């Protein structure tokens, strides 16, 4: 009895570590999101060629977040980051109606990869502060999320510059990755 109580306490109070891969088309807001979570402020960004990686501490969880560039020429490199990924954050520019089909294609291509079969999916419908932004329901439809039968997924409306919705997304990740782990 004492040993199981000790194990329970260890689970409750030990820091969990989670490997998160954040991808999406170029200019969706991935790097802005990463540094808003890490530093709590808006940083000036340039297009990411390669990746940024940061550890974000939140609610007794240490998220290692890999922010990988989204330009079309470097998207084939995404697969090099798939191994051991527990959670996938797919960032969508909710204002970019012209490329939401391209975003859908890239998302589904990734989700078909064997190395990501156990990863949960969090979609950040970003740039909700813009007047023509599609809402989360419209993004869900355009990305074909309801067709993902074997995948645990969630969509969160966000605004990277204000931070709105970002921590709600991390809450969902922490609750859903830990229940799968």
Swiss-Prot record:
EC id: 3.6.5.2
Alphabetically ordered keywords of this record: ER-Golgi transport, Golgi apparatus, GTP-binding, Hydrolase, Lipoprotein, Myristate, Nucleotide-binding, Protein transport, Transport
One GO CC annotation: Golgi apparatus
Top-rank lineage group of the source organism: Eukaryota
Catalytic reaction annotation: GTP + H2O = GDP + phosphate + H(+)
Primary localization: Golgi
Protein name: ADP-ribosylation factor 1
Species in which this protein is naturally found: Salix bakko
Gene: ARF1
